[in-house]
Amino acid sequence: MKIVTAIDSFKGSMTSMEAGQAAAEGIHRVDADAEVIVRPLADGGEGTVEALVSGMNGTLQKVQVTGPLSEPVICEYGIIESTKTAVIEMAGAAGITLVSDEERNPLNTTTYGVGEVIRDAIDKGCRRFLVGIGGSATNDGGVGMLQ
């Protein structure tokens, strides 16, 4: 039997791939001969880059950008070279997981770093952009990234 698992992440506890691997282990307990393929899945927030880059044979990039509280963060994004497309998660540069519970205040956060990721992708030849906007710690309507 051939089975594909594609499970979204469980915020704060498991990545998409960890959840898929857990399901695969459970399937193998019942049927040791099953062929289980684990694929990442995301809804536009955390895990979107991993899912799309994996499925579209892209490459991962890392760039230091301004985080949601104006501190430096390393943001990972993807490039699909065949279409010059960048795959970006707002969560990577301005995500809620980058802000402690005590510091969560949308009046103090920015999407500026998302714009820096876009600039890096442009510098690497990208002309198309897929931007997942889930998992954000911001409420600036994207004004920060336009700066």
Regions found by a protein language model. Name each.
Residues 1-147:
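N-terminal loops that bind phosphate or other acidic moieties
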